[in-house]
Amino acid sequence: MHKIGNLWLIGTSHISPESVKEVRKVILENEVDIVAIELDKGRFLSLMGKKSKIRIREIRRIGVKGFLFMLLGAWVEEQLGKVVKTKPGAEMKSAVKAAAKIKARIALIDQNINITLKRLFKEITWKEKFRFIWDIVKGVVLRKQEIEGFDLRKVPSENMIAKLVDKVKDRYPSIYKTLIHERNIVMANRLVKMMQREEDKKIVAVVGAGHVRGMMEIIKKKI
């Protein structure tokens, strides 16, 4: 967790029971005024069970490739979540429930998923697509022992996260650019505006651990 000005920035793992507990603890103990989460409106409604059906017009909006990529990502998270008996996004739900308990305001700071997926499939190369699919197959089938040796219940160390993000940047530059870097800019800028507009308010932001380093660099430059 990082503290800067009136902001607490918490990096989480979307399938970690440890993240669920930490998020709830920080929000309740500090009695914050605003809880910002790494979701857009559509994903927020889906996570909270208020919007479960995927409509045809939504598939058209993000494209068939974007839709399939979204399903693949959700499936991978679900399989890993089963290992640790935690549903993907549980830490975001925990943040929302903790915010409701102390009557804190919820702020959705992520970029619209439709924009993100359109950007991804405009930038990604065939080479990266094949690498991505091969790495998933290799990870699930050939390196199961390595996954089992990694403690999915905990958020990896900052050093480990930095190495993983750098590896993504090197191996999948387009995926890094659209799924990490561009969203870092969007979320960090929204938080900076919020911090400046709500100077007297305590703000907790809950984002995936892979976003923290990049977001902190942007925030520090602008505060």
Task: Indicate where each model-derived feature is located.
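Compositional signal for N-terminal targeting/processing segments
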Residues: M1-I223
